[in-house]
From Swiss-Prot:
Its EC number is 4.1.1.22. One of its GO terms (biological process) is amino acid metabolic process. It catalyses: L-histidine + H(+) = histamine + CO2. Its cofactor is pyruvate. InterPro entries: Pyr-dep_his-deCO2ase_N, Pyr-dep_his/arg-deCO2ase. The keyword Transmembrane helix does not apply. Keywords: Decarboxylase, Lyase, Pyruvate. This is Histidine decarboxylase small chain. The lineage of its organism: Bacteria, Bacillati, Actinomycetota, Actinomycetes, Micrococcales. It comes from Micrococcus sp. Heterohexamer of 3 large and 3 small chains.
Amino acid sequence: MKKTDKILKEIGIQRVAIMEGKKYSKGFMEDGDIGVQY
């Protein structure tokens, strides 16, 4: 369950980031990992 929860959380964060758009995209490109931002 934990692995699935982590994946779902990351998908949720990614979805928010897509809606937020440019606000987060630079950080994602630099880090190369969605999780690093949070």
